[in-house]
A protein has these predicted regions:
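Feature captures the catalytic ectodomains and active-site-proximal regions of enzymes
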Residues: 1-503
Length: 503
C-alpha cells in the first residue's frame, strides 16, 4: 500500500523582500510560486537572530536553519555559546585549548591558529581568534603563527584587507602572533572534494609553497589589483618559518563543520588520499565536532545533543523518511537536520546528487536541481515514504556569487522544480510544504552598488499545499511541529516549536 507523503521543500537562500532592481526573487519569472501563493495558505517565518539561537540581528545560515527546522525548537548556536564563554572566562579553561598550548610549551613547538578571518558569524568570528591569541600570550607561548582564510562571502568581497590589517594590529598590541599565510576560503574551505584547491592551501601552510609576500596587507591589496576578491585569493606565504611541522599544535577556530572537514583530514588522517603529502603527528583541535570519527583530534566544544528531533522521532514511530539534496547541501538535510548526528536513523534513506564541477555556480545556475527533482519525484511516486525532506541549493549558492543575472536563473530553475515536486506529492494524496532556511538571492547589491554575496536577515516564506487552513507567522522551529500536526501526530516533549496552523 502506497504511503501519502508529507514533503518539505527547502529553497535554500530564498528570502522575502520588496521588489527591487537587485532582488533576483522578484525579478525572476516564477509562475509556480505565484500560483502556490494564490491558491494555498501561506505565511512568513523568521530565520535569523534570536529566533534561530543566534545573537540579535545576526543573519541566519544553512547550518543553523536546518538545525532549527529539524530540531523543532530554537537550538542555541555555537557563535553565542563560544562568545559567552569568553565573557564568563570559561573559554580560557577549555581543556582542548589548554592541551594544545601546553603541548607547545612541553615540546618546544609552535602553535598554529587558523580559520575564517571574518566577523560574518557563519563559520567563525574574529573575536574568538583574538581570545585564543590572548590565551597564548598569557601562557607565554613564543611561536604563534596565524593562517588567515579570507571570507568575501558572508561579508563584503573586499573586506579582507581590513580584517588582515586589524589582525596585524592585534598582533602588535598583544606582542604575540605572526601572520604566516593568507588565502581565500575557496582553497582552504572547500567541501566538494576539489582536492586541487585544498592542496594549494595545504602546501602553503605545511610546505611554505606558493606566492610569497612578507607583508600580508600588501598581499591582499595586490590580489585586489589583479581583480581577485577575498574568497578567491590564491595562497600567499608571508612567513616561511611559519609552516606546520612535527608535533606542532593546531587550533582550527571555525565552528561550522562542513567546510572544515577536508583540510582537517588532509592534516590529521594517516590514510588520506586526496593528494600526495606526508603525514606527521600534531595536537589538532577542532573547535566543534567536524565529523563523528574524531580521528586524531580534540574537540573544544562538543555538540549539545538535540534529542528527539524530527528525524529521530519519526524513526522511533516506525515511519519512513527520505533526505535528498545535491552535494553542496547534502550535509544540511542529513547531519545538520539531525542535530549534528552523522548516522542514519532506521527508516531514513538518503539520496546524494553530485553538484556540477564548475569554478563558481553563476556559470551553471541550474546546478543539479533538475536531477534532484527527477530523483525526488521518482521516490515520491514509489509510495515508500511518509516524510520527504528536500533541498534546492540554487538560490543560496548562486546568490553567493553576487551575479544578479545568474541568481535570477537560479530562482527560475527552483520555481520549475518546486512545481514538479508539489504536483507529484499532491497526486499521491500527500501534503507539500515550501519554505526556505534563510535569505540571500532577494538582495544582491550593497548600498554602494557593489555585489552583495552574503545572507540576509529577511523573513522566509512558508506555503502549505494540500491542506486548507489558516496559518500564523512563526519561526523555523515551528516547521517540524507543523509537519507532525498535519500527519496527526503529537510533538515529543523536547520540541518547543508550535504548529503554524491556527486552531
Amino acid at each position: 500500500m502506497n504511503k501519502t507523503p508529507t514533503t518539505l521543500i527547502i529553497m535554500d537562500g530564498f528570502g522575502i523582500a520588496p521588489p527591487a532592481d537587485d532582488n533576483a526573487v522578484t525579478l525572476a519569472k516564477t509562475p509556480v510560486l505565484d500560483r502556490l501563493f494564490q491558491e494555498y495558505a501561506h505565511t512568513t517565518l523568521s530565520a535569523s537572530g534570536l529566533d534561530v539561537g543566534l545573537p540579535a540581528g545576526q543573519m541566519g545560515n544553512s547550518e543553523v536553519g536546518h538545525t532549527n527546522i529539524g530540531g523543532g525548537r530554537v537550538v542555541f548556536q555555537d557563535l553565542p555559546r563560544i562568545s559567552r564563554a569568553i565573557e564568563d572566562g570559561s573559554f580560557f579553561r577549555n581543556e582542548a585549548y589548554n592541551k594544545a598550548m601546553d603541548d607547545c610549551l612541553k615540546n618546544g613547538t609552535a602553535l598554529h591558529l587558523y580559520g575564517l578571518l571574518s566577523n560574518g558569524g557563519v563559520h567563525s568570528h574574529i573575536d574568538h581568534l583574538y581570545a585564543l591569541m590572548r590565551m597564548a600570550k598569557d601562557k607565554g607561548l613564543q611561536r604563534v603563527y596565524l593562517h588567515c582564510f579570507l571570507d568575501g562571502r558572508d561579508v563584503s568581497p573586499t573586506s579582507g584587507k581590513g580584517f588582515v590589517q586589524a589582525l596585524a594590529d592585534k598582533c602588535a598590541e598583544l606582542g604575540v602572533g605572526k601572520i604566516a599565510t593568507v588565502m581565500g576560503r575557496y582553497y582552504a574551505m572547500d567541501r566538494d572534494k576539489r582536492w586541487e584547491r585544498v592542496q594549494m592551501a595545504y602546501d602553503a601552510m605545511v610546505y611554505g609553497e606558493g606566492n610569497h609576500n612578507p607583508d600580508p596587507v600588501d598581499a591582499v591589496a595586490q590580489s585586489y589589483a589583479a581583480n581577485v576578491t577575498d574568497e578567491f585569493m590564491e595562497p600567499v606565504v608571508c612567513d616561511s618559518e611559519g609552516t606546520i611541522s612535527d608535533n606542532d599544535s593546531v587550533i582550527f577556530f571555525n565552528y561550522r563543520p562542513d567546510r572544515a572537514r577536508e583540510i582537517t583530514r588532509a592534516i590529521v588522517d594517516p590514510d588520506f588520499d586526496g593528494f600526495q603529502r606526508e603525514f606527521f603527528p600534531t595536537t589538532y583541535v577542532c573547535n566543534t565536532e567536524y565529523d563523528a570519527t574524531r580521528l586524531n583530534v580534540l574537540v573544544a566544544w562538543p555538540r549539545i545533543a538535540v534529542k528527539n528531533g524530527l528525524g529521530e522521532y519519526l524513526s522511533s514511530l516506525g515511519l519512513t523518511q527520505l533526505r535528498i539534496a545535491e552535494t553542496e547541501k547534502y550535509a544540511h538535510v542529513t547531519f545538520f537536520f539531525n542535530g549534528g548526528v552523522e548516522k542514519q536513523y532506521p527508516g531514513e534513506d538518503r539520496v546524494l546528487v553530485a553538484s556540477p564541477k564548475v569554478a563558481t555556480y553563476d556559470l551553471q545556475p541550474e546546478m543539479s536541481a533538475v536531477e534532484v527533482c527527477d530523483k525526488c519525484v521518482e521516490r515520491i511516486e514509489s509510495g515508500a515514504y511518509d516524510v520527504i525532506i528536500l533541498n534546492f541549493a540554487n538560490c543560496d549558492m548562486v546568490g553567493h556569487t553576487g551575479v544578479l543575472e545568474a541568481a535570477v536563473k537560479a530562482v527560475e530553475t527552483v520555481d520549475t522544480c518546486v512545481g514538479r515536486v508539489v504536483e507529484a506529492t499532491l497526486k499521491m494524496g500527500g501534503i507539500a510544504m515550501v519554505t526556505a532556511d534563510h535569505g540571500n538571492a532577494e538582495d544582491m547589491k550593497q548600498p554602494d552598488g557593489s555585489p552583495m554575496t552574503s545572507h540576509t536577515t529577511n523573513l522566509v516564506p512558508f506555503i502549505l499545499c494540500g491542506a486548507g487552513t489558516e496559518l500564523r507567522t512563526g519561526r523555523l522551529a515551528d516547521i517540524a511541529p507543523t509537519i507532525l500536526d498535519v500527519m496527526g501526530l503529537a510533538c515529543p516533549p523536547e520540541m518547543d516549536g508550535k504548529t503554524l496552523i491556527v486552531k
